[in-house]
Amino acid sequence: MKEVEVEGTQILIANVNGNYYAISNKCSHMGNPLSQGVLDGNIMTCTGHNAQFDVTTGKVVTRPKVAFLHPKIKDVPSYQLKVEDENIMVKL
């Protein structure tokens, strides 16, 4: 996985089984960089409170683990991308 900036937007690019996906690099819970998390298959786990996102869609898989609280969390934006030769182009 790799963190890039496109027109001021922080993007996380992940390779899942040879396919590339792009989502926001900011956790929708507390804004932590997802690129500092752990990618297991297509599931990205944020290091902040262990919220999990599907990098292929940006959908929330597991809510943050915060004792006695039920924090609001949204899906993170996902972006279309195209691979040409050795370049990856992200459409915002």
Feature-to-residue mapping (PLM):
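N-terminal pre-ligand scaffold of iron-sulfur
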Residues: 1-41, 59, 72-92
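Mid-chain, well-packed structural core segment of small domains
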Residues: 37-63, 67-70
